[in-house]
Structure formats: structure tokens, C-alpha cells
UniProtKB/Swiss-Prot annotation:
<dbReference type="GO" id="GO:0045907">
    <property type="term" value="P:positive regulation of vasoconstriction"/>
</dbReference>
<feature type="disulfide bond">
    <location>
        <begin position="442"/>
        <end position="469"/>
    </location>
</feature>
<keyword id="KW-0812">Transmembrane</keyword>
<dbReference type="GO" id="GO:0070374">
    <property type="term" value="P:positive regulation of ERK1 and ERK2 cascade"/>
</dbReference>
<dbReference type="GO" id="GO:0022614">
    <property type="term" value="P:membrane to membrane docking"/>
</dbReference>
<dbReference type="GO" id="GO:0045429">
    <property type="term" value="P:positive regulation of nitric oxide biosynthetic process"/>
</dbReference>
<protein>
    <recommendedName>
        <fullName>Intercellular adhesion molecule 1</fullName>
    </recommendedName>
</protein>
<dbReference type="GO" id="GO:0044877">
    <property type="term" value="F:protein-containing complex binding"/>
</dbReference>
<feature type="signal peptide">
    <location>
        <begin position="1"/>
        <end position="27"/>
    </location>
</feature>
<dbReference type="GO" id="GO:1904646">
    <property type="term" value="P:cellular response to amyloid-beta"/>
</dbReference>
<dbReference type="GO" id="GO:0034698">
    <property type="term" value="P:response to gonadotropin"/>
</dbReference>
<dbReference type="GO" id="GO:1904996">
    <property type="term" value="P:positive regulation of leukocyte adhesion to vascular endothelial cell"/>
</dbReference>
<dbReference type="GO" id="GO:0071333">
    <property type="term" value="P:cellular response to glucose stimulus"/>
</dbReference>
<feature type="domain" description="Ig-like C2-type 1">
    <location>
        <begin position="41"/>
        <end position="103"/>
    </location>
</feature>
<dbReference type="GO" id="GO:0045121">
    <property type="term" value="C:membrane raft"/>
</dbReference>
<dbReference type="GO" id="GO:0071549">
    <property type="term" value="P:cellular response to dexamethasone stimulus"/>
</dbReference>
<feature type="short sequence motif" description="Cell attachment site">
    <location>
        <begin position="177"/>
        <end position="179"/>
    </location>
</feature>
Length: 545
């Protein structure tokens, strides 16, 4: 039979008729199945049957969907409903005589969501700010058995029922550093297990979040304000505490020109270092600019640099090496706008001309002196100052004067009178002064034996005597007598002392022995006398016979 599609209003009219007009006694219409669960666009066979025995029985099926009558009998008909798009209630009706009756079935349609989509995430999300996640669900039935889940990686953030079409669910996340690189997604769950089917999932596209953090927004630009021509300067720009440092871009510009640099990125630190040779070609004033880019943020720091040229002062000696008594001129000159502010020396002896007392700054200072031995290795110091951009800069120069003079052998150089104990360890110091350094010889005047200069491990009495020391160099010579006295004790004296001590001790022993002998003898005599006296008393007291 040809497929037909019922008119929309007819089922409603039939229901009303069935309610208002009761059927004949015993007549009943039935529909099978009374409930059906099928996918959207599916088909189902519906059987309408009646208990009416009237030969003119009219039996039919009303539905919104395409139907085909597959077969029929006197009181039944079998239909096929196709392309069912949504939940519906097909109606079997009968005309039995002058009455009508009907029965309906429930068809529930299930379908998977047509669209499950997580809204695109921002290119960068700042740490500490709220991120709103949105998941859109279109389609899917039955809605009572449909839910949507938001995920961060494998962690469930939110689970909500889907009660509208389309349905948008949201969830707010406080972004953290740990969310950098995290994957976010959403999926739907259509639970058809109560109907004997499975749990079906539809997953959205996974989106990755990138977070950033800039707790400190001030770049650190480490560089001097003043740059001297002829020097190699290092510029350093850095920022600490940012995240992720590996994604940060940092660069340096000087005078609008990008500098070649070395950059360092660690866990939460980024830096850029550039080395620049300062030349005369550079402008006297330049802008140094550091730029850091992270996410959609840009940080900048600028510094004004001043270029200057400042050469060290020129310090000269009329002669760097002179003889004792010669006159020496010391001169210090500054150039390029610099001023000499100090010309001095390490020696406390003042110069013989023009002095070094404070004076107003000038481009040149000089003085003269008559060289003496005290001026040997005297260091002269010159300081020049240049004011640049309100700051005073200084450069210094030093020179050393060498004075040639003959040997000196004073008490401070060679004590000349030593008294040592025989057998002791001593150090004999005798060092003449002079330039060039003089040689020294010391020998005993009596026999020419040399004086032991330096470490003496054991002093001997044979070293005792007067020595003549001679210091000499190409500048002359000088002599001086020195004395070494060795204290010692004669062995014969010790023998006599020991003998006397032995005699004294022997005499003391003899006297003590004699004293002890006579004392014991006297005690014995005393005891004997006492015994005799006692015996006599006893004899006198005895009665006569």
C-alpha cells in the first residue's frame, strides 16, 4: 500500500471523539507496542487491532510520521512508521457501528548531540584572574538522560544536566601557574542504560591554556649613566619573578639600533646582556631602551647615556733616575677640559719649590726637589678631574723616582754591638743601604776571621771579638767597627766549686755523725744513773732481817 501522512488535526479530534462517545459494549481497540524507544530517523511497526465483530469495522492509525500499511485482517492492521524525528504518540482508532474508540502508544526518540564545543580559550590568561569556560551543547535526546562534563586534563571540574537546546554551561577557574599548558575539554554523556543500551559520550575539541604572571612590572637596567670613549661597556637588563620565563622575549636598543646580545631564561628569571665598544662616532647623548614581551604584555625601561672622552693626566719627571743632590722637576698635565686637582708624593718630606698646598684646579702643576737618599723609590701621585653631567670623574697617574747614592751603614742597618750567650741560637743582621745595593764584608780585626751574618745555630766563644765591616758599591764605600761579645763560664771554676761543695757536704755529715754519737752516749749514761738511784732507794726501804 502507498505510504500516507496523516493530517495534523485528526488525532486530536479522534481523541476527543473517543472520550465523548463511548464504544459499544464489549468493543475495544488496542495498539502494539504501547511503548517504543528508537533512534531519531528510525522506524517501528505498529499493530492496531479491535474486538469489534461488525463487518463494517473501520480501523486505522493516525500519526505525524510517514506510514505504510504492511498487512491487514478483518479486525487488525499492521503499519510501519518511518523517519521518526521526535517523541510522539501514534493513535489507533476504530469505527464500530455508530461509535468510535482509540488507543495510543508512546514513542521515545533518542539522538546524540550534534555539537559539543568548548569555546576558544584566550591566547594568554593572567595568573590570579578568573577564566570562564563555556561549553555549548546542541541536540541530544532525551534531555532527561543527557549531561555535560567539563574537564581539566582528566580532572572533572563540573557536571551539569542538559535541560535546554541549545545548552551552554559555564565554569569559572582561578588561573594559576600550574594551569600553564593544561588541556581543557568538555563532553556529553547520554545514559541509555535504563533502556538496555549503553552510556554514549561525545567529546569536544581539546583546548590548551597558556598562563602568565608578571608580579613585578619594573625592569632592572644595570648600566652606568656615563660612558667613556675607548672603553668596552656591558649593559644588563633583567626581570625576576615572571612566568613562564621561557616564553619571554627581551632585547636592548641603543640610539634606535638593536644590540647584539646574549639572553638567559631560567625558571622565573630572564636577562639580556650586550657589550658595546664606546667610540668617538657615537652621539654624546644616547637613549638605552630595554623591552620585554610576554603574552600580550610589554614592559619597557629607558635610560639616558652620556658619552665623554677623558684621558689620564700626564705625569713626568725631568729624570726618572738621578744622583744624590741632583734637582728633579715633577710636572702633571691634564687635557680635554680636565683639571689637575692634586699632585703629591708618598714621602712626608715637602718639595723644595712651589709646594703641594691646596690650590684652585688648573690644567698643569709642577714643583722641583733636590734628590736625597730618602727620595729613593718615592712615588709621586697626580689626580685630574673632569665634570660630566654634574658628576666629578677622576683619573690618576703615578711615577716612582730612583736616586743613586753611596753605601750607608748606620745603627739602624747594622746594630754593631751584640752580646750573646755561648750555645744560644741567634740571628745577626747587618744590611747596608744604597743604590745600587752595596756589597758587605766583615772580618775580625785580629785574625781576619769573617763575621757570621745571618742565622747562627750555636754561638761559640771563638766568635768573640771586634770586626771591621766594609760596604761598597760603584758609588763608593764605607767602613765601621762592630763588636761581638760571647758570654761563657770556665770549666776549672766549675771543678773548684764542685770540690768545695763536696767538702762542705762531707764536713756536715761528719759533724752530724759526731753529734749523734755523743748525744746517744750521754743518754745511755743518764739512764744508767737513774737505774742505780732506783736500786738504792729499794735497798733502803727494805726491813731488817
Amino acid at each position: 500500500m502507498a505510504s500516507t501522512r496523516a493530517r495534523p488535526m485528526l488525532p486530536l479530534l479522534l481523541v476527543l471523539v473517543a472520550v465523548v462517545i463511548p464504544g459499544p459494549v464489549g468493543a475495544q481497540v488496542s495498539i502494539h507496542p504501547t511503548e517504543a524507544f528508537l533512534p531519531r530517523g528510525g522506524s517501528v511497526q505498529v499493530n492496531c487491532s479491535s474486538s469489534c465483530e461488525d463487518e463494517n469495522l473501520g480501523l486505522g492509525l493516525e500519526t505525524n510520521w510517514m506510514k505504510d500499511e504492511l498487512s491487514s485482517g478483518h479486525n487488525w492492521k499492521l503499519f510501519k512508521l518511518s523517519d521518526i524525528g521526535e517523541d510522539s504518540r501514534p493513535l489507533c482508532f476504530e469505527n464500530c457501528g455508530t461509535t468510535q474508540s482509540s488507543a495510543s502508544a508512546t514513542i521515545t526518540v533518542y539522538s546524540f548531540p550534534e555539537r559539543v564545543e568548548l569555546d576558544p580559550l584566550p591566547a594568554w590568561q593572567q595568573v590570579g584572574k578568573n577564566l570562564i569556560l563555556r561549553c555549548l551543547v546542541e541536540g541530544g535526546a532525551p534531555r532527561t538522560q543527557l549531561s555535560v562534563v567539563l574537564l581539566r586534563g582528566n580532572e572533572t571540574l563540573s557536571r551539569q544536566a542538559v535541560d535546554g537546546d541549545p545548552k551552554e554551561i559555564t565554569f569559572t577557574v582561578l588561573a594559576s601557574r600550574g594551569d600553564h599548558g593544561a588541556n581543557f575539554s568538555c563532553f556529553t554523556e547520554l545514559d541509555l542504560r535504563p533502556q538496555g543500551l549503553s552510556l554514549f559520550k561525545n567529546v569536544s575539541e581539546v583546548r590548551q591554556l597558556r598562563t602568565f604572571d608578571l608580579p613585578t612590572r619594573v625592569l632592572k637596567l644595570d648600566t652606568p649613566d656615563l660612558l667613556e670613549v675607548g672603553t668596552q661597556q656591558k649593559f644588563l637588563c633583567s626581570l625576576e619573578g615572571l612566568f613562564p620565563a621561557s616564553e619571554a622575549q627581551i632585547y636592548l636598543e641603543m640610539g634606535g639600533q638593536m644590540l647584539t646580545l646574549e639572553s638567559t631564561n631560567s625558571r622565573d628569571f630572564v636577562s639580556a646582556t650586550a657589550s658595546v665598544e664606546v667610540t668617538e662616532k657615537l652621539d654624546r647623548t644616547l637613549q638605552l631602551r630595554c623591552v620585554l614581551e610576554l603574552a600580550d604584555q610589554t614592559l619597557e625601561m629607558e635610560k639616558t647615556l652620556r658619552i665623554y672622552n677623558f684621558s689620564a693626566p700626564i705625569l713626568t719627571l725631568s729624570q726618572p733616575e738621578v744622583s744624590e743632590g741632583d734637582q728633579v722637576t715633577v710636572k702633571c698635565e691634564a687635557h680635554g677640559g680636565a683639571q689637575v686637582v692634586l699632585l703629591n708624593s708618598t714621602s712626608p718630606r715637602p718639595p723644595t719649590s712651589q709646594g703641594t698646598s691646596p690650590r684652585p684646579p688648573t690644567s698643569q702643576i709642577q714643583f722641583t726637589l733636590n734628590a736625597s737618599p730618602e727620595d729613593h723609590k718615592r712615588r709621586f701621585f697626580c689626580s685630574a678631574a673632569l665634570e660630566v653631567d654634574g658628576k666629578s670623574l677622576f683619573k690618576n697617574q703615578t711615577l716612582e723616582l730612583h736616586v743613586l747614592y753611596g753605601p750607608h751603614l748606620d745603627k739602624k742597618d747594622c746594630l754593631g754591638n751584640w752580646t750573646w750567650q755561648e750555645g744560644s741560637q741567634q740571628t745577626l743582621t747587618c744590611q747596608p743601604q744604597g743604590n745600587p745595593a752595596p756589597n758587605l764584608t766583615c772580618s775580625r780585626k785580629a785574625d781576619g776571621v769573617p763575621l757570621p751574618i745571618g742565622m747562627v745555630k750555636s754561638v761559640k766563644r771563638e766568635m768573640n771579638g771586634t770586626y771591621k765591616c766594609r760596604a761598597f758599591s760603584s758609588r763608593g764605600s764605607i767602613t765601621r767597627d762592630v763588636h761581638l761579645t760571647v758570654l761563657y763560664h770556665d770549666q776549672n771554676t766549675w771543678v773548684i766549686i764542685v770540690g768545695v761543695l763536696v767538702l762542705i757536704i762531707a764536713g756536715f755529715v761528719i759533724v752530724a755523725s759526731i753529734y749523734t754519737y755523743y748525744r746517744q752516749r750521754k743518754i745511755r749514761i743518764y739512764k744508767l744513773q737513774k737505774a742505780q738511784e732506783e736500786a738504792l732507794k729499794l735497798k733502803v726501804q727494805a726491813p731488817p732481817p
